[in-house]
Amino acid sequence: MTNGNGTPPEGAPSPQLNVLAQYTKDLSFENPNAPSSLAPQQKPPSISVQINVNANNVAQDEFEVTLTVEGKAEHNDKLMFRFELAYAGLFRIVNVPQENLPPLVMIECPRLLFPFAREIIATAVRDGGFPPLMLDPVDFVGMFRQNMERQAAVQQKPS
């Protein structure tokens, strides 16, 4: 509840987002063509990366948010490496209006997880014999909006 100007009334409990835990749920790195894939290449490989966010309400005010990052590098249609990471966090969110929960859970929580997931992937790729893969920043706001638009389109389709 607000006092009319968008701020909570004086004495109202303030919103809180707490990170209770962060953990790797699944990590896979494949280098199926080693050692030939480790030889110097004339041009850089083609790299593709897919990122998804899932969230589950696991207890009152607690959400498990999982950031899934899958990717591969190919050179001349030959797989150099492939990786998959499911990195999750357990978040406690209190004193937040129900209508504000989805963006908080699907934007802010993955934004907090991403730097850790990025480091895990960079290290796994480096340990696989390649230069570390530094993932570009992710627009979680854009991902959230696309998902909302997709859901709205599905709901508007006639049965």
Curated annotation (Swiss-Prot):
SUPFAM superfamilies: SecB-like. GO terms for cellular component: cytoplasm. It holds the Pfam family SecB. InterPro entries: SecB, SecB-like_sf. One of its GO terms (molecular function) is unfolded protein binding. One of its GO terms (biological process) is protein tetramerization. It comes from the Bacteria. Keywords: Chaperone, Cytoplasm, Protein transport, Translocation, Transport. Homotetramer, a dimer of dimers. One homotetramer interacts with 1 SecA dimer. Belongs to the SecB family. One of the proteins required for the normal export of preproteins out of the cell cytoplasm. It is a molecular chaperone that binds to a subset of precursor proteins, maintaining them in a translocation-competent state. It also specifically binds to its receptor SecA. This is Protein-export protein SecB. It comes from Nitrobacter hamburgensis (strain DSM 10229 / NCIMB 13809 / X14).
